[in-house]
Amino acid sequence: FSVVANSLPYLWKGFQYTVQLTAISAVGGLFFGTLLAMARLSSLKLLSNFAAGYVNLMRSIPLVLVIFWFFFLVPMILQGVTGGDRPPQVGAERTAIITFIMFEAAYFCEIMRAGIQSIPKGQVYSAYALGLTYGQSMRLIILPQAFRNMIPVLLTQTIILFQDTSLV
């Protein structure tokens, strides 16, 4: 048991990093997922198609591949764009945070979109009848109700995110 006891400080540090990475990625993914969901539900076809393409692409690629692409390919792309003689170093921690946020945003987008669409259209029409704008009706009426419906699925996706942090 001495091996386990000697490893406890390292395990504790790893646990703290895992929780930190999960929290940052969940908050960032939820923020960008909400924006993507609003874009997917937009009446602007270009915006809606871009968001749908992003979500479909990210959900069809394994996370480990996204991490590898970001870590190895993005520095080469940045070198080509900036014209530098060496590719800039992105860093492992920055790669992990950015890729997890990008990846989870696609999943949170679908959860958010389903939650928003679960609210009856009468709620939206009532908000418009009260004189609220689209943004006000979403912020004050639709999203609070939708979040209540989405909490179980959002927590499940966050648990999956916690498990996915083992890749980094």
Tell me what each language-model feature is.
Residues 1-168:
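Transmembrane alpha-helices and adjacent helix-loop boundaries
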